[in-house]
Amino acid sequence: MNLNTLNEFRHGIYGCFGNAKDALFNTIDALSSEAAARSFPELSFSPFFERTWASLYEALEDGQIDAQRLRQVFVQCAPLPAAGQYVFLGVDTSNLYRPEAETAQDRTLVPMANLPKDAHAACPGWVVSHVVLLPSQAGQGTFVLDTARVTSTELATVVAVRQLQAVVALLVARGLRPIIIGDRWYACAPFLARLSEVSAHCLLRVKSHRVFYRPAPVRRPGQLGASRKDGDRFQCSDERTHGEPDEVWEGSDAKGARVQVRCWKHLHLRTARWVEVSVIQIIRHGANGSARDPRVSWFVWKGDDPAPLAEISPTSRLRYSQEHGYRFDKQVLLWDVPRLSTPARTERWTQVVACAHNQLLLARPLLDGSYRPWETRRSILTLGQVRRAMPTLLRQLGTPARPPQPRGKAPGRAKGFHPKPRARHPVIRKTSKKQKKGKKTTSA
């Protein structure tokens, strides 16, 4: 990574902006460097935001961002390996809670995270889906490749497939071999069926009670009735249905604890029989058996190449970097702090946060870092340390944004004008569409 790549990235994202492009770019630089900001208007205190605090809100209200072009810039400037190598993609969603925003449109009930044990709660808000480039080693940070809000009329799996189709096509064109890593709710038949059209391998975590089926047996001569559509049952939590695995690997993890990996091939889900997958069981003898550190984990592998059993366990843990990225975006880059009134403004703010996140990752090799007295010096800087050192680099780079042009004072509202109260919008509850069985009627 060099200064030219960072300059190319900055000019590339500036070219993706339409209206209010200068204010949007100033917002990215302010977000990347103003470590003292704890609220959205405080970003205007940054010397790299050359406008007043009201321009922050006006940029998100009037701004335009070309999402397709922004995705291309992200892929073009991402720290990708050489052609022919594997590249790991993480797909996941994160929630922006808006419980009191009655005037905000298209809010859905989303589950709340980090609750006490056995506690379940839902809160109105918006769901945003991310596709990120996962680092090959822990602690290096993720690189955002695409963001999209999940509307009330769509499912997160459908949005994720649409994102992955666009991102994977760009990566394959560069000669790379993507591997998609996802959590349990993506290991469903609709997602796997749609993903069969994507030129990528897939490693998804599976719930322990998930049921698969083996291929249907060959029809015997003279057999009566319809042929079986599914073979024997395979339930992850029932060892009696497993049988002998097709492949077994045994080794140790980074801490020296014993790890066993078993693989059963040629399985499928009942509602997606044409999608053949391999079911993988990982037994980590060094785990404590808790929900956060399970002893036994289940995964699904889909791809043209056989599952690399020796790499499955470390590869599956790469997705945790995406959760750390969400935490950084919310706690440091103020992603969930602004109380924006429309979904469109929230989508623009999400794209601005993604630009700032990626800019910090690209700038990390160019900076020595800014350490606090109690911080231990590390070989790899955290993105927070990079953010504190960014002002020096931004002064060296300059900005493609034009300086502000004061327009004087606005005339204000006309005398006697009274704005109407904003419309209230209900919270939308997503439910599964199941046909109710009709009641049988008897004729007299």
Regions found by a protein language model. Give the residues of each.
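Short, conserved catalytic/metal-binding motifs centered on acidic residues
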Residues: 43, 85-99, 131, 179-187, ...
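Basic, amphipathic alpha-helical segments enriched in Lys/Arg and hydrophobic/aromatic residues
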Residues: 337-393
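Short amphipathic alpha-helical "interface-anchor" segments enriched in bulky aromatics
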Residues: 95, 309-340
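Long, low-complexity C-terminal extensions of enzymes
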Residues: 369, 376-444
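Gly/serine-rich nucleotide phosphate-binding loop at the start of the catalytic core
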Residues: 1-74
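Active-site-proximal, Lys/Arg-enriched surface segment
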Residues: 59-139
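Electropositive, glycine- and tryptophan-enriched low-complexity nucleic-acid-binding patches
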Residues: 54-58, 113-177, 276-307
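An internal, acidic/charged active-site-proximal segment
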Residues: 149-281, 371-381
